[in-house]
């Protein structure tokens, strides 16, 4: 079965990773390099195990456009969202034998090197991907 692993971040998180002054301490170049090396290794392991279907990191929320229907008319709003709002930062789609295995994969993300304040608040969601209408029912 396929599962999507989702991670989240705010505009402040993206700014801090880029080394910009923000409400959160800026990441050092070493912090960022360690995170990138971990993600490359994590992804390589999933490729080698045959479990990786796709993965992508998303750009900062400031580059977002939201389309919403208001009084029957599509209205487009440019980012940024409120700086403290967490939005989707990246995802992995994995194909593995069970929800438990997908959860094990996601749990490895908790070991990603990052400044302490990031590690304390980082979360990953794991969701099964529906292949049929019946799987959409709960």
Residue ranges, per PLM feature:
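Conserved, structured core segments of small domains
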Residues: 1-138
């Amino acid at each position: 079965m396929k599962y999507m692993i989702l991670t989240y971040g705010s505009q402040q998180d993206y700014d801090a990773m880029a080394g910009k002054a923000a409400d959160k301490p800026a990441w050092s170049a070493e912090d960022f390099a360690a995170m990138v090396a971990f993600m490359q290794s994590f992804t390589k392991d999933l490729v080698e195990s045959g479990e990786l279907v796709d993965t992508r990191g998303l750009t900062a929320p400031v580059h977002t456009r939201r389309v919403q229907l208001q009084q029957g008319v599509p209205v487009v709003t440019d980012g940024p969202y409120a700086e403290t709002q967490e939005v989707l930062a990246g995802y992995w789609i994995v194909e593995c034998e069970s929800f438990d295995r997908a959860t094990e994969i996601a749990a490895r993300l908790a070991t990603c090197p990052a400044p302490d304040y990031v590690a304390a608040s980082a979360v990953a969601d794991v969701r099964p991907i529906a292949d049929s209408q019946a799987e959409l029912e709960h």
